Amino acid sequence: RYAQMRLAPARLTHCMRWLGAAARCQHIALEHARVRTAFGKPLIQHQGVNFMLADNEIAMHQARLAIRHVAWMLDQGIRARHESSIVKASVSEELFKVADRCVQILGGIGVTNETVVEMIFRDMRPFRLYDGPTEVHKYAIATQLERQGSAFTDPVGW
C-alpha cells in the first residue's frame, strides 16, 4: 500500500529528471544548428532541421505542463495514480523522441562521446521502462477508462 502511494511522485521525479536532460540535448543541438553550415547557410535555416527543433520545443513544453499538472494534483492531496500513468507514458515517449531528434541534428557527432547528447540518448531509453514500461501504463489507463470513463468526456469537470 505504501509503495502504491509513492508511485506517482516517483514517476514525476523520473519525468522531471529526463525533461532536464532533454532540454540539455536541445540546447546543444540548437547551438550546433546555429553554428554548423550546410549548402551555404546555417543548419537552423534548413526546414528539416528547424522543424525538428520546433517539434522538440513543443514536446518539452507539453511535458512540462503535464508534469506541473500532476505535481499540483499531488500537492492538493490527490493520489493522481491515473494521471501520473498518463504523464509517465507520454513524457517518456516524447522526451526520447526529443533526444533522438537532437542526435539527428548533430549528425555524426551525435553518436559519439564528443557531446553529452549520445550519453543522454543512451540513458534515456531505459527511462521508458522505469516504474513500468509504457505498455503497462497504457493498460492501466485503459482499465481505468473501462471502469470510470474519461475525465475528458465532461469538459466542464476540469
Question: Which residue ranges define each predicted feature?
Answer:
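Alpha-helical interface subdomain recognition
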Residues: 4-158
